[in-house]
Regions:
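"…together with the soluble PPM/PP2C metallo-phosphatase catalytic core" -> "…together
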Residues: 2-179, 183, 187
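Positively charged, low-complexity/disordered segments
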Residues: 184-186, 191-199
Length: 199
């Protein structure tokens, strides 16, 4: 457990300061190019730079790369690739008007690194029945969970800060559960959750 603390602290610090430091530069660069939209959550017609996720994805990817240097396991590599691909899909969706089919289908393909690297467990643990191995069901869940999560976050983002607040609360709870778990690989995955919620 102790060997996880230093990498976690380094990843969290790098994620926080990279996002904190890059955001003003990203905002200025976008405003200079007039890439702005009306803030729909304010009464006044305030123009804001978009997309702001450019600095966030840098922070997430840097923190995950640091974790991967310390713990070169397929789960972290799969998260690095899946997160990056999902960001590209979101960026395309923001910049161009695509059909309603594009985002869910493209996000489903983003699950490819998880499947190809085998970064999932096909055993389901039920409180009453114990562990059950259902590989086909789990493969389907992996493919569907990425577009479901992406669209869920979009649907709850009704006010500034709601999506980030929700994901922070959910990630923090998952981090605690993962760190308590006796499995060492699961604890390492928990560290990656912690980086997201504390950055």
């Amino acid at each position: 457990m102790e060997q996880l603390i230093i990498p976690a602290i380094i990843a969290i610090v790098v994620a926080f300061f990279s996002v904190y430091g890059l955001t003003p530069f990203v905002i200025r660069a976008l405003e200079k190019r007039n890439i702005t939209v009306v803030d729909a959550n304010k009464k006044e017609k305030t123009m804001i730079a978009r997309p702001g996720g450019l600095s966030i994805i840098v922070g997430i990817e840097l923190s995950l790369i640091i974790l991967y240097v310390f713990f070169p396991i397929s789960e972290i590599l799969a998260v690095i690739l899946t997160t990056f691909f999902a960001f590209i899909v979101g960026l395309i969706d923001d910049r161009k008007t695509m059909g309603g089919w594009f985002k869910p289908l493209a996000l489903a393909f983003c699950a490819a690194p998880i499947l190809l690297l085998g970064a999932y467990d096909s055993n389901l643990d039920f409180p009453l029945f114990g562990s059950v191995k259902i590989p086909l069901l789990y493969t389907a869940l992996v493919v569907f969970m990425i577009p479901i999560m992406g669209n869920t976050i979009n649907s709850i983002d009704v006010l500034n800060g709601v999506a980030s607040g929700f994901t922070t609360i959910a990630s923090f709870a998952l981090s605690i559960l993962s760190l308590i778990h006796i499995s060492e690989p699961t604890r390492r995955r928990g560290i990656s959750y912690a980086v997201f919620c504390l950055k």
